[in-house]
Curated annotation (Swiss-Prot):
Entry similarity comment: Belongs to the universal ribosomal protein uL14 family.
Pfam families associated with the record: Ribosomal_L14
Cellular component GO terms, alphabetical: cytosolic large ribosomal subunit
Keyword RNA-binding: yes
CDD domains per record: Ribosomal_uL14
PROSITE patterns: RIBOSOMAL_L14
UniProt subunit comment: Part of the 50S ribosomal subunit. Forms a cluster with proteins L3 and L19. In the 70S ribosome, L14 and L19 interact and together make contacts with the 16S rRNA in bridges B5 and B8.
Organism listed in the record: Bacillus subtilis (strain 168)
UniProt keywords, alphabetically: Ribonucleoprotein, Ribosomal protein, RNA-binding, rRNA-binding
Protein name (record): Large ribosomal subunit protein uL14
Functional note: Binds to 23S rRNA. Forms part of two intersubunit bridges in the 70S ribosome.
UniProt xrefs under HAMAP family: Ribosomal_uL14
GO biological processes: translation
Length: 122
């Protein structure tokens, strides 16, 4: 589960390497987010020459979490790290590549472009 002040790795080539969560979107007073939820972040580390600069406020969707997500068949899925993909307002990714696996829950939340770019969907 991701909450305010959580740092996440960025799993795309938008230029950001690490972001800090500012707000969890979706309802007033919502405290935590899980895989497939949209968050507002600020960029803490960025690569030189990238599309996204350090200090920029961006929206991102969570693609991997250490604390697992429960699926409808009763199984749980968890990853080794917390990671997100930076998105535009129309839910399309700002980068052109996705690194590492992403969860199948993104397909249910209509992030089809991220699912199609990902090397592996778990």
């Amino acid at each position: 589960m991701i909450q305010q002040e959580t740092r996440l790795k960025v799993a795309d080539n938008s230029g950001a390497r690490e972001v800090l969560t500012i707000k969890v979107l979706g309802g007033s007073g919502r405290k935590t987010a899980n895989i497939g939820d949209v968050i507002v972040c600020t960029v803490k580390q960025a690569t030189p020459g990238g599309v996204v600069k350090k200090g920029e406020v961006v929206k991102a969707v969570i693609v991997r979490t250490k604390s697992g997500a429960r699926r409808s068949d009763g199984s749980y899925i968890s990853f080794d790290e917390n990671a997100c993909v930076i998105i535009r307002d129309d839910k399309s990714p700002r980068g052109t590549r996705i690194f590492g696996p992403v969860a199948r829950e993104l397909r249910e939340n209509n992030f089809m472009k991220i699912v199609s770019l990902a090397p592996e969907v778990i």
